[in-house]
């Protein structure tokens, strides 16, 4: 890269920032060293990402840098189409609560810890869970669902998605981290947050799959009418 490409980033975004692949899945290319405090750390991390990981090209679709939001993290499942809000299902969000031993800058889904590889990052003490899921404060649920739906509409989403949201602990403002297109689907909370979302919503995995299929049938009918 040319270092001038990173000029002014901290002036615009503040510190710390997180740099990550524009397109990825399963936290690939994301680790605690992606959170950087200055331009030297940023450039070093960018060079590492362009080098790739185990043959994967982490920068194939570019990299993005954004402010690192310190605060609680939520995730929301949506089934339906952006242009049919009355037929869409916005599930109750869950809060992803990270192990209390972690510093704030390490409370996110890093690849190393998520998949228990532990090449560069340590496991939790006493074999503790990296994270657990709980229902958020009831007073926040509507706002989390609204910002998630607005992000889905902005992306013209269809089918299903999972939207990750954070609240700035200082300002209490909600920010969308990403809209996960075709997120992993499983009822097992050890593999995806969908299992936790279904649990707090008192829904079965079969019911979710039926909702997704019915939405696909509806879009097909509307397209052929």
Regions from the language model: what does each represent?
Residues 25, 97-101, 169, 183-185:
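Feature marks short, surface-exposed loop/turn motifs that line or immediately flank catalytic pockets
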Residues 27-29, 120-133, 193:
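A short small-residue
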Residues 4-12:
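Short amphipathic alpha-helix with an adjacent loop that forms part of the alpha/beta core around
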Residues 22, 67-68, 165:
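Short, well-ordered beta-to-alpha junction loops that form the rim of enzyme active sites
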Residues 85, 129, 134-225:
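ATP-dependent carboxylate activation and anion-phosphoryl transfer catalytic cores
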Residues 17-18, 62-64, 160-162:
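A short linear hydrophobic-aromatic micro-motif
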Residues 16-47, 73:
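Glycine-rich phosphate-binding loop of ATP-grasp-fold ATP-dependent ligases
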Residues 39-128, 139, 146, 173-175:
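Phosphate-binding site of ATP-dependent enzymes
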